[in-house]
Amino acid sequence: MPYIEPVRTAEVWDPELRELIERCERLGVPDSLFPRILARVPAYAKALLRAMLLSHTEGNVDHKLKEIIRIQLARRAGDPYFAGLRSAKAMADGLDEAAIAAGCDDYERSPRFSEAEKWALRYADRMYLDPASVDAAFYAGMKHHYSEAQIMELGAFIALHYGMQVFMRTLGNGAPT
């Protein structure tokens, strides 16, 4: 059980927050646990959940790729909760555990990923392992595969989800319930 007790679903009175929690449950990422912990501060919960859902399910970068990145980051953050969750949408669209494993391992040598996908995975790696290497030359290389808008979409997604994963890890929860 996490160090901060989640609010019971029946105690969530704000209709927008209830709908966001239901959307999270349908997607599977996050399930209802993390949103119900955040629900102790409803305004913050709504803002964070809207941002998490928007960054993960919308935009012009493939959702399956974002899901691989999200899991890669959760593993890097040492968070078994987020690392164990799977997007129902990504799985329905054909993402499988073999692709996730390849994206979290030696994706650079994997024939499974295009050069563009490798750049996105590399971006996530470098933002947390070697941020100094994400420089003008790195962005110039990314621009061969992604528009500036897509780069911003990926960067914001990476920063937000990694931060939430580190936060959840500090709350002391293990694998998903």
Feature locations, PLM:
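Mobile cap/lid helix-loop segments that border enzyme active or cofactor-binding sites
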Residues: 1-63, 87, 91
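Alpha-helical transition-metal enzyme core signature, strongest for iron centers
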Residues: 41-45, 72-83, 120, 124-131, ...
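Conserved alpha-helical segments that form or flank metal/cofactor-binding pockets of metalloenzymes
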Residues: 66, 70-100
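C-terminal end-helix/capping segment
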Residues: 94-96, 169-177
